[in-house]
Amino acid sequence: MRKIGIIGGTFDPPHYGHLLIANEVYHALDLEEVWFLPNQIPPHKQGRNITSIERRLHMLELATEAEEHFSICLEELSRKGPSYTYDTMLQLTKKYPDVQFHFIIGGDMVEYLPKWYNIEALLNLVTFVGVARPGYTLHTPYQITTVEIPEFAVSSSLLRERYKEKKTCKYLLPEKVQVYIERNGLYES
């Protein structure tokens, strides 16, 4: 059975924290690949102003192109409405019955697991992999695999704020993503 990691998110923008998490889990669990799963509309971010999927997808392609064990999974982009992990993983497990999926989440999402849509059924489809994130614990009533990663306290919201305030973001995200953001005037207001 193939072992594939999945890291979902809005990736608005993708940054070195995402890549670090994916790479650390890839090596720690001896995965075949890690798939980045951009969300169409995350249920917990409905109503928030999110960069277009076309731009987020392009930035994600730029961020992951150098790593042959990273791929982008477009499963959620064809659906309208909120992107529920259960619906996505149900589709993926049917499409890839020979794959054991490891769904990678940060400490913030580990704490939020009891509120996830159809969580009990989802636990039958994936193995959750929790990674520590500053300010969050990995305590949950559910069985998860934990992977220790070097602390890298950067988030997409921090980067959007830094761009808005015209602060440097060098060394926080891949240079090609940074150039794309600056050329297209993303996150300026």
Curated annotation (Swiss-Prot):
Native source species: Bacillus cereus (strain G9842)
Family label: Belongs to the NadD family.
Database matches in Pfam families: CTP_transf_like
Molecular function as annotated in GO: ATP binding; nicotinate-nucleotide adenylyltransferase activity
Pathway the protein acts in: Cofactor biosynthesis; NAD(+) biosynthesis; deamido-NAD(+) from nicotinate D-ribonucleotide: step 1/1
InterPro entries assigned to the protein according to its UniProt record, in alphabetical order: Cyt_trans-like, NadD/NMNAT, Rossmann-like_a/b/a_fold
Annotated EC: 2.7.7.18
Function in brief: Catalyzes the reversible adenylation of nicotinate mononucleotide (NaMN) to nicotinic acid adenine dinucleotide (NaAD).
Protein's recorded name: Probable nicotinate-nucleotide adenylyltransferase
Broad enzyme group: transferase
NCBIfam families (UniProt xref): cyt_tran_rel (TIGR00125), nicotinate (nicotinamide) nucleotide adenylyltransferase (TIGR00482), PRK00071.1-3 (NF000840), PRK00071.1-4 (NF000841)
One annotated GO biological process: NAD biosynthetic process
Domain of life: Bacteria
The keyword Transport belongs to this UniProt entry's keyword annotation: no
Catalysed reactions listed for this entry: nicotinate beta-D-ribonucleotide + ATP + H(+) = deamido-NAD(+) + diphosphate
Entry keyword set: ATP-binding, NAD, Nucleotide-binding, Nucleotidyltransferase, Pyridine nucleotide biosynthesis, Transferase
Keyword Zinc tagged: no
